[in-house]
Amino acid sequence: MPSCCCLLGLGFPSPPSALRILRRRMASRAFQLRLNPLTGDSEWLVVEEEEEEDHHPTPPPKQLLATTSYLDMLNDSARNRAYRRAIEAAVTDPSSRVLDIGAGTGLLSMMAARALAAVGGETRGGSVSACESYLPMGKLMRRVLRANGMENRVKVFHKRSDELKVGDDLDSPADILVSEILDSELLGEGLIPTLQQAYDMLLAKNPKIVPYRATTYGQLVESTFLWKLHDLHNNEANAADGVWLTPGEMERIVSVKPQQHAMQCDALEDEIRLLSEPFKVFEFDFWKRPDSHREANIKIQTTRDGYVHAIISWWVLQLDSAGSIFYSTAPRWARQSSSEGPQRDMKDWCDHWKQCVWFMQGKGIPATEDQVLSLRARHNQTSISYQLNINDEACDRSSKGDHLTLLPERIALYGDKDWRSALINTIKNALTVKSSPTCVVADDSMFLALLISSMSPTSKVIAMYPGLRDKGAAYLRSVADANNFSIDQIQVIGKRASSITADDLKHKKVNLLVGEPFYLGSEGMLPWQNLRFWSVRTLLDSMLSEDAFIMPCKGILKLCAMSLPDLWRSRSSLKDVEGFDHSVVNETLGACGYLPGDQQGPCLPYYVWQCGYTKKLSKVYSLMDFNFSEPIHSCFGKTKIEFSHDGTCHGFAVWIDWVLDERKSVVLTTGPDNRYWKQGVQLFGKPVEVNPGKSVMHVEASFDPSTGEITFSSSSTTCS
């Protein structure tokens, strides 16, 4: 985020009065970075803060907050209830000074203010201060406070907690700290440095802390699916197609990042073999200043033979000092086990806190029943890492310039035999009619650059690599010999399409324009944001030969009606949250269900297979075609859905099938049955009870080429 001094550093002295005015204006605005899905360019949005006396503030832009996890958190009743009980237990002194760091909508602050009032704090000098650095959320918090008559009982600071100062912002050090700066790994949102700074600068001696303690747990598992998510080398060896993304002696040149990866592991329960009981890893005592780094050596006795492919981890939060209020992110099988410790309340499915997966390298670590394995766990200020069998030090290329880290799903896709075969056969057919072609890889595909270069020694391959850039070039140099091509065949330009000129192509016409499509950094976006490939093709239109081969040649928007009760509940509109009205946040946070007028929540990206209980209620329908032989243009489509199963329809899943070769019907589908892709999920304004032969639904969609967005509308009818 640009700072005031950055904008003032123009080389001209500013008069003191102008400086004060600009500083005041900068203090009341923030800049939100947004990625344009069709160009890959970053765009700045300005978020203004209203003056204190403005009692009718403009809500923050919907798109800024609708894709966050705030709504899911506020629908997590177990979490809300646990925090309320713990705060009420902590606030017993009417003179308490409460500080809420990372206040969000202000829910915890309002709980503290209510608890303070209950013990007479309003007349005894008690106070509540809320710190929220993200201005769009801070604006929303002020609306929530006003809706609940709390605007004068909670003091709001749009600052990071390390910018707060006792004496300037806070009248005196706080003696109660409440916070929820936790992620699925526990530490990833900066919990430790935030608490350290608070203990050093903002808190009184011996403060009360909510939550009081957290304990992390782990469990050794065997899972073919999890193995495929990280072991590219052995999976592409099984494919045996001659293309080596990870040649011998370079097994780790493409890998997942060595970190904990958040995942809904309950969805894998039936295909996971547990190789150990749950074991305790670290205990974090928040009631005292936390350490930055620690290490633990743990002995784990295995419970059966198998290969350790991963460690699944979770945490248990103790919110009160008495040890009576807990919240757990454990998977279902561990919550049902008594070995974890005190019984935890069963809770609803939620998406904001998942379990985490730490992958073992290669084929996994072999284990026999009752074997004792040594695990070394380390944590720093923001993450926890593991090393199983301490003497088994693996080669780590991560510091080398040719090493690439990808998301687990991309690793699995690159090792998938069917996916590779579809691309190989399509490119092979294209090259039979192209002599010494000039080929442009229009995305960040390493696979296609290697494939074409190795299949066609006379080809000239121009890899755009707008995300990989120099790292992609270094990688290709490292694996060229193993794939039997000269690196001189490939030119990595590292540019977006809007910056490419005929000079970059040596004034040659492009015979092949190909993509997976895959754009580094865009993996979590909605499926149609990969239509960036269509935008690139349009920008390169004048550089294409008349008979240019384009792959994929078409995208088909598909959809399927779904029952999604767990996802619906987590995204449903809010009313009362532990006694506080949150209805003002619904539109901004993208809630669904029973909203005024025809409002509906946004279409959001999810791995549908991880969305709790799901059921398909219809067959798959085609809704819209995108023809890449033409320049990008607006599109419209509609279809009638006839239901094949009884149930409650909460919305539909939508995705794009990529047609690689229309003549040979080579299609890559990315629907819910394919677990390596996210789908878009459009939830309805109200759930609909459906019956085969009696219920139909009409769905329309339109694509706007200027924004890359697709909008949906739907209506249902019941036949007598």
Swiss-Prot record:
It is an enzyme of class 2 (transferase). Keywords: Methyltransferase, Repeat, S-adenosyl-L-methionine, Transferase. It holds the Pfam family PRMT_C. GO terms for biological process: methylation. InterPro entries: Arg_MeTrfase, MeTrfase_PRMT7, PRMT_dom, SAM-dependent_MTases_sf. Its EC number is 2.1.1.-. The keyword Thylakoid does not apply. The keyword NADP does not apply. One of its GO terms (molecular function) is histone methyltransferase activity. Signal peptide: none annotated. Residues 54-385, 387-720 form the SAM-dependent MTase PRMT-type domain. The active site is at 180, 189. Belongs to the class I-like SAM-binding methyltransferase superfamily. Protein arginine N-methyltransferase family. PRMT7 subfamily. Arginine methyltransferase that can both catalyze the formation of omega-N monomethylarginine (MMA) and symmetrical dimethylarginine (sDMA). This is Protein arginine N-methyltransferase 7. It comes from Oryza sativa subsp. indica.
